[in-house]
UniProtKB/Swiss-Prot annotation:
Membrane topology summary: Single-pass membrane protein
Gene3D superfamilies: CofE-like (3.30.1330.100)
Lineage: Archaea, Methanobacteriati, Methanobacteriota, Methanomada group, Methanococci
Protein name: Uncharacterized protein MJ1361
InterPro entries the UniProt entry points to: F420-0_gamma-glut_ligase-dom, UCP006563
Gene Ontology CC: membrane
Keyword Transmembrane attributed: yes
Length: 292
């Protein structure tokens, strides 16, 4: 299996990405073949839907304070260690800024619910990276529709029968023979909608050696039905590999420092490199740069 990130320009809020993605694939020099996977970032799809929420408009209530202290102190100093959360995540929880976190937690409570806000980080698929200003970006409202539309356009323009997947970077966990995610929804075969309980189950499975991290989470899939022969574990692994090759903002503070600003703007986002699409060739063997 080998993954190829596809560069596009920054997709703006409400902009139809389908012709942009098709053109980017044409210009990439990669020859698509029947059965290849074209994997889309959920952020690009949600941005195209205009699905932004301004967190500055939310006034924190009692539950937001509860979620803040629960995340920063109980997870940062107790549960994080017990459930073997990565050390960098624990450090970030302990440094969690109060004002911004309270607004973010209140947003999560009102948009997707308390059971997602209780997750210490990456709550409910609501993302703060690669979005301008004080906006947050929830999961796409209809990822299946976009996957189907892109599939049809690729088949029409390029004459190939591919699989189109929309995937989120948030984890899917395996517990024995079952798959869980803390996200509000996922493809069939992954138990979703359980919020923080999915996260706790996944961490416990890792500690007890009965499962653990399986990969990233496919939200929708369409096109060539060859995908039906793949297990949930294989599909989450494909999504994970795509996440590894995406070029995206990993550290907002580094970007703010580089551009000497306190807020990310669309103008800054347009200057950054974006690879919200990844082509995965299942049958092609990965080779290190030195062997190519």
């Amino acid at each position: 299996m080998r993954a190829y990130p596809i560069k596009t320009r920054y997709i703006k809020r409400g902009e139809n990405f389908i012709p942009i993605v098709v053109e980017a694939i044409k210009n990439s020099g990669i020859k698509l073949e029947d059965g290849d996977f074209v994997v889309l970032s959920e952020k690009m799809v949600s941005t195209a839907e205009g699905n932004f929420i301004d967190e500055s408009k939310f006034k924190p209530g009692v539950l937001a304070y509860l979620c803040y202290y629960w995340s920063k102190y109980l997870w940062g100093y107790v549960l994080g260690k017990l459930l073997k959360v990565k050390e960098d995540k624990i450090k970030n929880l302990r440094r969690m800024p109060k004002e911004e976190t309270l607004k973010h937690k209140q947003t999560i409570i009102e948009i997707v619910g308390l059971r997602y806000a209780l997750k210490p980080y990456a709550e409910g698929g609501v993302d703060l990276t690669n979005v301008p200003g004080t906006y947050a970006c929830p999961l796409p409202k209809n990822p299946k529709k976009w996957a189907e539309e892109l599939y049809k356009e690729i088949k029409k323009e390029l004459g190939v029968d591919v699989v189109v997947m929309v995937a989120d970077t948030d984890a899917t966990y395996r517990v024995l023979n079952f798959y869980f995610t803390a996200l509000p929804y996922a493809i069939d075969g992954i138990i979703s909608g359980i919020g923080v309980f999915g996260f706790i189950l996944g961490r416990l499975a890792d500690v007890l050696k009965i499962g653990g991290f399986a990969g990233c989470t496919p939200l929708a899939i369409a096109g060539n039905e060859v995908y039906k022969k793949y297990s949930i574990g294989e599909l989450t692994r494909i999504a994970f590999i795509c996440d590894r090759v995406h070029k995206t903002i990993k550290n907002i503070n580094e970007v703010l420092e580089k551009y000497n600003t306190y807020v990310i703007t669309e103008e800054i986002l347009e200057k950054l490199e974006h690879t919200p699409v990844v082509v995965v060739k299942i049958k092609e063997e990965y080779k290190p740069e030195s062997q190519r």
